[in-house]
Each structure stands twice: as structure tokens, then as C-alpha cells.
């Protein structure tokens, strides 16, 4: 869970609020302008409120044994991945030709979903999501923030 401590003493402890604060300071790629705010927040809320709990059940299926892992995956696809895929089959990013705050907020969760069973994800009929995720994973931005830190001693 990221936490931002501002020089004023204010603490921002929600990922979306941190993103919004940072983009209000500087938005050189226009992520806030690239999407209608209501629609962007709809996708982010769908991710946070619906997809994330389903992702956790899929990712940590040994903790959620009331259904098999494939049932958790199917629920996540129906509720979130399939609608996202339909959208991304029409346009390279959620709201057109340019990335938006919603794209940057969602892709880490879709990345987690893909890596639970990478072979299955790569073979699934999800061309829109797969292409979109590949762009993010191949981006300089992703490479810059995913630098491996040395392990801390116990």
C-alpha cells in the first residue's frame, strides 16, 4: 500500500488519491485529459470494487476453497476482463488513441491477473487486453518503476 507524506505534513494513503495528487502537480502525458472523468472513475471503481476481490480469490485460490480456481477466474473474466477486452478491441487505450489515468490505474491489476496462469492468459481469446497489457509491460515507464531492489536482510 503506497503512502505519500507531503512536506505540509499531509498524508495521502490511497493509490488513486496519490495518482490524482501527482497528476495535478504535473501531467506531461495528459492522462487526466485523455478520458472523461466520470467514465475513468467508473472503470477504476469497477476495478477496485468488483475486479480486485475476484482477482484476490483467483490469485490466492488456496485461501478461497469454496470454488475451484478456474471458477474464480471465470467470475473475474465475466465481471471485468471481458468488458475491458471488448473496449480494447475497438481502441488501443480505454478512451482512444492515448493512455488515460484509468489505463495506468488498471494495468497493474490486469498484469497480476495475467501472471496467475500466464500460459492460460496468453492462449485465451483476449486479444484486446493482451495487446494493451503488452504495450504497458514493454513501456519505459514500467521498466523504470519495476527496477528490482536488493533484498533486505531479515
What are the residue ranges of the model-derived segments?
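GST-like domain detector, emphasizing the conserved glutathione-binding G-site
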Residues: 1-74, 92
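Long hydrophobic alpha-helical segments typical of transmembrane helices together
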Residues: 127-154
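Catalytic and substrate-binding regions of cell-wall glycan-acting enzymes that process beta-1,4-linked
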Residues: 119-127
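Amphipathic, well-packed alpha-helical segments that form the structural scaffold of globular domains
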Residues: 56, 60, 82-86, 110
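GST superfamily/GST-like fold recognition
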Residues: 94-119, 136
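Structural signal for well-ordered, non-membrane alpha-helices
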Residues: 48, 52, 81-85, 137
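Surface-exposed helix-capping loop/turn segments at secondary-structure junctions
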Residues: 86-97, 141-146
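Amphipathic alpha-helical packing segments from all-alpha helical-bundle domains
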Residues: 71-88
Amino acid at each position: 500500500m503506497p503512502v505519500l507524506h507531503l512536506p505540509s505534513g499531509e498524508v495521502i494513503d490511497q493509490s488513486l488519491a496519490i495518482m490524482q495528487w501527482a497528476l495535478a502537480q504535473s501531467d506531461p502525458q495528459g492522462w487526466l485529459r485523455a478520458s472523461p472523468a466520470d467514465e475513468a472513475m467508473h472503470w477504476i471503481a469497477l476495478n477496485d470494487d468488483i475486479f480486485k476481490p475476484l482477482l484476490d480469490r483467483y490469485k490466492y485460490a488456496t485461501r478461497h476453497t469454496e470454488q475451484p480456481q478456474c471458477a474464480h477466474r471465470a467470475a473475474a473474466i465475466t465481471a471485468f476482463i471481458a468488458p475491458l477486452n471488448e473496449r480494447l478491441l475497438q481502441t488501443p487505450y480505454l478512451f482512444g488513441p492515448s493512455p488515460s489515468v484509468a489505463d495506468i490505474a488498471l494495468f497493474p491489476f490486469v498484469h497480476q491477473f495475467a501472471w496467475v496462469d500466464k500460459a492460460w492468459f496468453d492462449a485465451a481469446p483476449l486479444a484486446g487486453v493482451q495487446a494493451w497489457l503488452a504495450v504497458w509491460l514493454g513501456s519505459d515507464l514500467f521498466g523504470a518503476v519495476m527496477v528490482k531492489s536488493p533484498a533486505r536482510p531479515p
